Amino acid sequence: MRNKKYLLVDTDYFTKQVEAEPLANIRDVDAKRFIWKSIVTQFGVPHVLISDNGLQFDSKMFRRYSGELRIINRYSTPTYPQGNGQVEAVNKVIVSELKKRLDDAKGKWVEELPHVLWTYRTMPHRSTGETPFSMTYGAEVVIPLETGFPTSRTSSFNPKDNDEQLAKSLDLIEEKRENAMVQLTYYQQKLKQGYDANVKLRPLTPGNLVLRKVVGTTKNPTWENLGPN
């Protein structure tokens, strides 16, 4: 556990379900293994994979593997990480929550990671109004708190009724996802309106001089040792 210093993170664009694995190395073979174990064997083959332009995702071997599975590879750049904003947002949450737990855990971030992922998967997401868990599996998860302090859902458990309820939930999962898509579209429109309201128009014509900002790949200083390499 102590030699794990990298974290490979995957987020589904729609359901917001997140998978993450601590790694000692982050080579193309490690990325390939992660794609197979954490994505393909659990959720099926993705249509598009958006990643940074690290060598582990842009090697001949990884491209060949993606081609065999008919996965389209797209890449964000270090100067514009917002191109993969979904994962960037999740990374901030994971790093923030890990930092909160590190003092009590004496720096054992690998052991704390499952707790952080569990919290993220079982909390409603602002953009969809649903939890990533329910968007993925069609039903809400029973959290440990419900077993210690019985709720109506756990105290009135009946195997037959439970099977029927699960079947109904699966029948309604497409409707739930359609409603979430409407909510997501509305949320994105509101974000766009807020962003556009603060944009100052600067009309340019051919021949105008412009200042080009060269952005380095420096870490966020608040992330300390938890930042990307």
Could you tell me what each predicted segment is?
Residues 1-176, 183-184, 189-229:
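Integrase module of LTR retroelements
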